[in-house]
Amino acid sequence: MADVLTELPGVGPSTADKLIEGGYLDFMKIATATIGELTDIEGISEKAAAKMIMAARDLCDLGFKSGVELLKQRQSVWRLSTGSTELDTVLAGGIESQSVTEFAGMFGSGKTQIMHQTCVNLQIREKIFADLEGVVEEELEAPKAVYIDTEGTFRPERVVQMAEGAGIDGQTVLDNTFVARAYNSDMQMLFAEKIEDLIKGGNNIKLVIIDSLTSTFRNEFTGRGKLAERQQKLGRHMATLNKLADLYNCIVLVTNQVAAKPDAYFGVAEQAIGGHVVGHAATFRFFLRKSKGDKRVAKLYDSPHLPDSEAVFRITEKGIQD
């Protein structure tokens, strides 16, 4: 790999080794980096970083595309069932790849249950929907999930229960799910950045879950004085997640906490944590709320192309169902 990176201007074997050590394993990683990120590596100046990035972008053919090309690129998007036909319908067929989907809600609203269910559904070929003209079949073979748990709510026994409810082996699901417990925002961001290492190691990561997105940031950055720092850090984290979704055609799911909205007289009386940073970075945004018994309501309130809509689903022993 070092020999390939030496094709970039100003990159000798020593610099190539430093780039690889810093996680920049290929041209695409360098092409999508910022000058500031590359200058963090010892021995790389701003001028050298700018040259590397521009050359890598040329090699990756990054630039303007026509609307027709983008429409064709959209054919490579695949979808994963949530387990609820009604919720899948709201999403026009299921959760989209190449996007970040947020599920926000109060405790007990079903956020973590949906995350567990998607890990199971990823191992069921009938739950994956793709246009085979745009998606190579091999791309969806042996898919794996990454679950970054920030609240200690991942339960392998619940995954097994859901898998058995779906008629598949729970051990298979667990074998194909990487779990990392993040105790602070630095760990959370590091785990997200390390996902590329798993992919480079031969793991076909197709689902990335952050449960929950903002809890560590919220605990560490308290008070208005630290709000700007929190939002900047959260913005970098969201950029990493969006890049993963785009470059590797995977699904990124995040759960989010909510806060009371005192000035809300109509509609939803809570708002998701994270402000405009999360609002602009998430592709699809849902509010979840409890209903009667085991029923939950999911409201899609932000999407680039789908209308606002609601779906009712149930949380049962077998998992997410209609």
UniProtKB/Swiss-Prot annotation:
**One GO BP:** DNA repair
| GO MF annotations, alphabetized | ATP binding; ATP hydrolysis activity; ATP-dependent DNA damage sensor activity; damaged DNA binding
InterPro entries in the cross-refs: AAA+_ATPase, DNA_recomb/repair_Rad51_C, DNA_recomb/repair_RadA, DNA_recomb/repair_RecA-like, DNA_repair_Rad51/TF_NusA_a-hlx, Hlx-hairpin-Hlx_DNA-bd_motif, P-loop_NTPase, RecA_ATP-bd
The entry's ATP-binding residues are: 105-112
Which keywords does UniProt give here?
A: ATP-binding, DNA damage, DNA recombination, DNA-binding, Nucleotide-binding
Tell me the leader sequence span.
none
Q: Which Gene3D superfamilies match?
A: 5' to 3' exonuclease, C-terminal subdomain (1.10.150.20), P-loop containing nucleotide triphosphate hydrolases (3.40.50.300)
Q: What does this protein do?
A: Involved in DNA repair and in homologous recombination. Binds and assemble on single-stranded DNA to form a nucleoprotein filament. Hydrolyzes ATP in a ssDNA-dependent manner and promotes DNA strand exchange between homologous DNA molecules.
Q: Which family does it belong to?
A: Belongs to the eukaryotic RecA-like protein family.
What is the name of this protein?
A: DNA repair and recombination protein RadA
Q: What is the lineage of its organism?
A: Archaea, Methanobacteriati, Methanobacteriota, Methanomada group, Methanococci
Gene, per the UniProt record: radA
